[in-house]
Amino acid sequence: TNFVIQELEKFGIEYTMLDNNSMGSFEEAVKKTTKIVYMESPSNPLLSIIDIKRMADFCYGRDLLSVVDNTFASAVNQNPKDYGIDLVIHSATKYIGGHSDICAGFVLGDQKHLDQVRQTALNFGGSLNPFMCHLLERSLKTLFVRVEKQNQNALQVSSFLETHDSVDRVNYPGLPTHVEHVIAEKQMRGYGGMISFELKDQDIIDFQKKLKLIQPAISLGGVETIISAPVLTSHKKLSKEQRKKEGIKDNLLRLSVGIEHADD
């Protein structure tokens, strides 16, 4: 969101931001100059789910390039290419790396598009050094078992939070109460390790200070459980009006669930 709002206009790129599955909204948003539909599912930090197959068909029928950021789901839980998406991107810093010690990214797609991406990378930089590649290879060996455990833990933790008196709302696509749970169930094998929730009466800073095992940090997807407040981190640079429009409340916390024992 920060990149779109603050950087794209510098390059003369126009954009329209949408936050729902209403095809009517997408129909209205598409202009003659529209080239790309960029999606994130689950989204950060509200864990909204997009019907990937429906959007792939929508883009294909209008000759639009479809791109899905699959970071929150990981390839273990969701494969947008199977539903017709043109390009899939991952922040390998997160679940693929899994140990909070890598800065990297992946792009998946057909050869034509990847050739363009590769040429752009050559022109602007972005090559990984050998040691980073070694760490990525190490991480891929444990990706499945890590994410499977994070799936299990997140479902248990989100179910606990949903019944807690101090919590006003829980966002996790694996919960039957999630507004897009049926869509998630259709296209995901697991629901990931990301949860967001809104506190009722507690201050978000005081709450984080009381935590013992869980540390405040801005990354995600690692083996350790960490927490952050979007209003103070990822969405801090947005105006209050922009955050309100996106549904980012001041009492919202984002939890990246690790592989510890869920009871802890």
Segments from the language model and where they lie:
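PLP-dependent enzyme catalytic core of the Aspartate aminotransferase-like
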Residues: 5, 14-16, 28, 32, ...
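Conserved PLP-enzyme active-site core in the AAT-like
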Residues: 1-166, 171
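Glycine-rich beta-alpha junction loops
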Residues: 94, 157, 174-178, 199-201, ...
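Short, well-ordered beta-strand elements within core beta-sheets of diverse protein domains
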Residues: 136-145, 192-199, 254-258
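A generic structural signal for well-ordered coil/turn residues at beta-strand boundaries
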Residues: 102, 191-193, 221-223, 249-251
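Conserved small-domain helix->loop->beta segment predominantly found in fold-type I
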Residues: 155-218, 239-240, 244
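Short, flexible turn/loop "capping" segments at secondary-structure junctions
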Residues: 98, 130-132, 186-189, 245-251
